[in-house]
Swiss-Prot record:
Protein name: Ubiquitin thioesterase OTUB2
Signal peptide range: none
InterPro entries hit by this protein: OTU_dom, Otubain, Papain-like_cys_pep_sf, Peptidase_C65_otubain, Peptidase_C65_otubain_sub1, Peptidase_C65_otubain_sub2
Gene expressing this chain: Otub2
Source organism of the structure: Mus musculus (Mouse)
Active site: 48, 51, 205, 224
Site feature: Required to orient and stabilize the active site H-224: 226
Annotated family: Belongs to the peptidase C65 family.
Enzyme Commission code(s) on record: 3.4.19.12
Domain OTU: 40-231
Amino acid sequence: MSETSFNLISEKCDILSILRDHPENRIYQRKIQELSKRFTSIRKTKGDGNCFYRALGYSYLESLLGKSREILKFKERVLQTPNDLLAAGFEEHKFRNFFNAFYSVVELVEKDSSVSSLLKVFNDQSSSDRIVQFLRLLTSAFIRNRADFFRHFIDEEMDIKDFCTHEVEPMAMECDHVQITALSQALNIALQVEYVDEMDTALNHHVFPEAAIPSVYLLYKTSHYNILYAAEKH
């Protein structure tokens, strides 16, 4: 499936279908074959610099479908996020529209357990981008509110405010471990990132936060994130 054949998030397809992305690359072929022993399917995301936020948002909400107790717990957390944004210095009128977009899709998941309805929202450019912008602002707020911790992980020449203003909040800015750590903690979402590179080494992955049981799995390759689906354990 080429990136031009879908809008923002693709339909689910077999993990081995991505072997044809690089048919001549022996290392890539081996690593995807290894990955297929633990993951059955993949959804591709558009490579627009927002792929991490969009992939995490969609994948976690999809994992909540049909789980009323977990949805309620997540709603309670989401309802607290405006306080986090206010504490970080954001004015309510500047984030309310983005918060409403995200909260609306959480309510949709609560009322409608269909994958197609959720996918439709995330493939609508306007709705999807508002959701991404909210997740970016929340990530920024979490970092700003814990500046003493996060300042150890960013460039010494850039303070926390500048980092958030230039590297986190703007659309299309790619993310790194700092943003992943912040957003996963801000929403209490455990995720596992599988790394596929062109080094002739073993596959490796990272769990955020460490030792947590992931509910979201992402594939990272050449600065891009796609959504993975783990094989059922028997």
